[in-house]
């Protein structure tokens, strides 16, 4: 019957030439068209051309067309359909403001399009009435017309018997009702479906906009004028909530059986704020849980009225706003830019604290954000949206859903054609759209078997810290679960009760006689006065404490390095007579390591002070510690002892040398391994002072330059040495170009404290005028006391010495301990240190500090009792004054500090300076990985990334199918030392560095997990805990000392070998022993002098590098010859070469050795080739003389072994008066040589020498079968 009526309608409409419907996208055809070809498929988009009061979701053609355009382009680009297969026609569904006329207009237009074969699918509809009518009509056309709508959410459209081809891209209000039910609904044993709600509200009232049922509705005299009064979307949404609640809960069904608490109104009429106040007074007598549904402007007026009545600030009322159209992007809905009264915005903000909003969940994918930008650009460029409407384009979920609708239709159409079925049959298309999931612009889109999308809803709440509405929970339509992702903030600190104690009308509270009220009033007045007195007294005391600034430390009170240097000089004078002390003025001390082992072996006497120091460092815990240490150290006494004299000769330890450290700050083991000046905690490599300065860029402190120590040299055993830097630094270890500097220390009131310099520019802040907030921050820091955080001693704000003073922990930081490969940490020690860290972090999170913000392994320090403490926390307002100089710090060090920072804080340009507790949990996970694997911070398996590259990759957001960059974890779960990691600890680490901060555990959960692992190792008895830690520490003592001793011996041997090359071995050994070298006279020695003839001319014709190369090659060759004879090379000066025989080892054949050496040198010169002048013969001139000399060491810096006497001068004259490539011999040397057979000498004759007169000299021609080489006739 319906088909016959449709055919009749087609005939009538054709006769009328189709002039009823206005076609926005294409011209109307005047004649009836022929049957359609297979392609294209005609899709009609039916939406209002302009906004209307009936359109609550902002759905217009101007907004939808750019979205549909992009969707069609993406379908063609993805090859789901070829170009030209879809023909879009846009209709204005609102030619008439009257909704009933608009409904008829749309229905007639659809029938006409069908009759003209221009209808294959329908997309759109902003009102439910027109949608319902058209859906019913098109169900009977041919095989049905598929309709896809982004609205149509009322439960009345759920019936697929009446609406068999309707697909709803936003689902139905039933999912909204389910989310409300799980959030607030009261549930008891009679409930059909249990709710997980913690609010458990039963007394609800609906306060919403609806023209048809409004209490302020204007009754028209003519009933025909009321046809436009239709039900609003608020009514449909609240109707769905009522229906769902009564289905799921028998209690609600019983309570709402007769009447549903509601208060509808017409917001299109002018409503004064006083009217809203009157309505809210009436509502407050019925319920304190008010469910709102109206436009954003109306909701703001209602909340302002509630604020004026005190309902929004009392904490007794809660407002739940249903706003599905605005979306979850409305972060500050209380602000109105056109509101000239700024106080109204502030008042509205305060009122919105009592408001919770439920809206469709907004996608936060990057693809969706890019899609929004593309749509806005298309709307302005192609459709001139901004100029036509006068406002910026704004996207919402109902508009963006058109993209998913086009994509879904294209997928179903493609599959229908591929299956060989009729693509114009509505059943074939609809059956392929329902019950499927596909990837849309908002992510995964799921359509149920009823044609409704599984929509997600967000619960938004005003975050007082971020000053905006944020998502605290969301409802997943696919899983029908409400998931919490944040914390609700309630006025008054807790949610209001469902029913006030006295009832809404105060009828449940009985009255009392007048005298009772007087007594109660008097009592309350006294309490108020007492309270005011206490308040003002405490405030007065607080102000006094703030003004006193007990934390303030004057720079003069810090006994720093200058004072320590003066004391050091005084103490050095007293120690000069000790045999075991090497004065710093001794040049040999500067040429060797500044940190050296004092003896090769240890004797019983040297261990007495060590035991004493170890006992005294335990603060007198019990005799058990001393006994245990004695057992561990007694192994050294079983070794062969060195006699005291030998020990002193080698710079060994004595009780006196150990006793001098009793007043210092170094640990006892420091005295076993290293000789350090008192109060100096610096550590250097075993290289010479000059080499150390060159390699580490360190300069003399007297010159005011900075110092740095290499990372390699910094690594020492756990608890072995205390450290100190002359250039300051921070409490944490500061990395600068592969160097490490520990914190500066000072003496404050007799106690060693750590100094952290604040990088505050003195020029910018010549005076620190602290605000009240900063003073409060410093006071809170001063009041903090806990076993596992460093004690805040105070701060210095004297210009320009801005610094923070804290407790000094001499064992170094956790980072240094982990980086030192020599330190073996067993599982119990790791758990113990980890437990200390968690306890310190737990205290901070529950204190007024709230969070650390800069947690890293270098901010975890270990004190002398092996207790780990958290440091460098708090004082965030003071740190805000600091400036970061990237050039001074270095890029590597700057980004390395960020490796512990949580990804959400890296992405947030306005991250809170104090950090977050969830950020601290992430930092804890990175530290935990460092401790378990000991591969360094953020160790990766097969990637060699710089800290900058790691930070950038961690900062970059990741999608759900991507794995975020995290430190490498072995698949077998093996940690450092091939120990299998505890599964609980591994799971805890992975959970703590989760990408989503909401998925990270609280610190209380972390503490509980770590405490369960360390239960056997940690007791409540401090002494027992200390005993265990001391025993663990002492277990490695023997191996560490032995290993360091061997390292020392190897370094000592290298230094001695180098020194023996600079000085005669006997002289060097005398200086090493600390004894002065006495000058010694020698009756007869032979001295050799030589130089290069024409060297000055040769140098002027050569480059400096060529000259250096020449001399180096020549002297290396000479040194090889000299080593074959019993001679001593004295020195080389330029081209001059001086050798002596007969000293320091006395021998009679000194002239013989020098003569043979001279002949060998001439033979070496014969074959010597000058690199840059290979064809030129090097001309060596040699002179030698015998006589008496005096030899001794001259100078304290760069000591030289020098010869003195007339013999030296005569030898030099013999050389200068000789000839090239000949050996000039004096009369004295001639007399000695002639006593031995074999030497061939030729008389030269008398030669006049400066200062000597005429001297008879000789030429040495050969020795036995060795002759002078033949250099040619020129040199014969």
UniProtKB/Swiss-Prot annotation:
**Binding-site positions, Mg(2+) 2:** 1091-1092, 1135
Q: Does the keyword Chloroplast apply?
A: no
Where do the annotations place ATP binding? 723-731, 756
Q: Which SUPFAM superfamilies match?
A: Nucleotide cyclase, Periplasmic binding protein-like I, Protein kinase-like (PK-like)
Where is the sequence biased in composition, kind Polar residues?
590-599, 642-660
Q: Where does Mg(2+) 1 bind?
A: 1091, 1135
Q: Which residues form the signal peptide?
A: 1-18
Its transmembrane ranges are 516-536
So which residues have sugars stuck on them? 87, 196, 338, 384, 387, 414, 428, 444
Q: What is its EC number?
A: 4.6.1.2
Q: Where is the Protein kinase domain?
A: 717-1013
Q: What is known of its domains?
A: The protein kinase domain is predicted to be catalytically inactive.
Q: Name it.
A: Receptor-type guanylate cyclase gcy-28
Question: What gene is it encoded by?
Answer: gcy-28
